[in-house]
From Swiss-Prot:
The gene is mrpl32. Component of the mitochondrial large ribosomal subunit (mt-LSU). Mature yeast 74S mitochondrial ribosomes consist of a small (37S) and a large (54S) subunit. The 37S small subunit contains a 15S ribosomal RNA (15S mt-rRNA) and at least 32 different proteins. The 54S large subunit contains a 21S rRNA (21S mt-rRNA) and at least 45 different proteins. bL32m has a zinc binding site. GO terms for biological process: mitochondrial translation. Residues 1-47 form a transit peptide. It holds the Pfam family Ribosomal_L32p. It comes from Schizosaccharomyces pombe (strain 972 / ATCC 24843) (Fission yeast). GO terms for cellular component: mitochondrial large ribosomal subunit; mitochondrion. This is Large ribosomal subunit protein bL32m. One of its GO terms (molecular function) is structural constituent of ribosome. MRPL32 precursor is processed by the m-AAA protease, which cleaves the N-terminal transit peptide. Cleavage by the m-AAA protease takes place prior to assembly into the large subunit, an essential step for mitochondrial ribosome (mitoribosome) assembly. Proper processing by the m-AAA protease is dependent on the zinc-binding region within the tightly folded C-terminal domain of MRPL32: zinc-dependent folding halts degradation initiated from the N-terminus and triggers the release of mature mrpl32. Zn(2+) binds at C77, C80, C90, C93. Component of the mitochondrial ribosome (mitoribosome), a dedicated translation machinery responsible for the synthesis of mitochondrial genome-encoded proteins, including at least some of the essential transmembrane subunits of the mitochondrial respiratory chain. The mitoribosomes are attached to the mitochondrial inner membrane and translation products are cotranslationally integrated into the membrane. Its main location: mitochondrion.
Amino acid sequence: MALLRGNSLAISQKMLSVFQASALPHISLRIFISPPSIANIWNSILLAVPKKKTSYTKKRSRLLSGKALKDKTVNRCPICGSFKLAHHLCSHCFRNIRREFNE
């Protein structure tokens, strides 16, 4: 096992030397972070923490609010005048049509 690791290390060093010769010149960029910018980042992290625990009532009201059932649009049937859901067949007219086809 150690022999394989040594061979692979030697092979990888040879390949690295070949690729380094043909690669583009190395450019190093040094970026200096000034201490005030670190302080600003640290303050934003500290300020993101809530000061007090959220109460049970507020938590439950937030979780359960806004989930009411949506209102259904109810229209009058243009044929018989009874109430029906929008984009649905009138149940009264449907029963009449069904009765006629069954006879």
